[in-house]
Amino acid sequence: VGGLGCDVYLFSAYKTFGPHQGIMVLREAFGMELPGQAHFFNQGTLYKRHTPAGPDHAQIAACAGMADYVDAVAAAHGIGGDAASRNSAVHDLMRAQEVAVIAPLLDYLAGRNDVRLLGPRDAGKRAPTVAVELDRAAVPVSEELGRNGIACWAGDFYAVRPLAALGIDREKGVLRMSAAHYTSAEDVTRLIGALDRVL
């Protein structure tokens, strides 16, 4: 993190298949400048100064599972080497799978005239999270997809300002579908079939 030259680095562990734990790295001098959030007697220790309830030991321990998971995926694919090279190779495997499975969905959505695909159409230039504006409210569509065995959601996803800038009514919301490295081509085929029925 020091190499980035930033004062604060925030990360959500669940974004890499870990627990719902926020991770924060503060440059020490900057962290000591910020107002403390804890007891007065903990103000001199950086990690205590900004952790008013103390560390959540269970969540911290669970974060080790992220590295264990990457190592398990590496082992399953015969990937060796040091931790950094295993992590890089597993990242590339996961990313290739995400791109492969999301591309047919993007092609399908781009071919419809009743949805507005948000973001790039090229699967290689986006995260495997796909949002579309519909010609109607998104929540009922999400609920109907759920009745068809598809787990997705609808709403604003805390992107209130970006949606407003795109001219999307917050009450109407968007439909969001996500893939991950464990999503199969068959999963996406089922999703497309359900979208055909529901839309």
Could you say what each language-model-derived stretch is?
Residues 1-199:
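Pyridoxal 5′-phosphate
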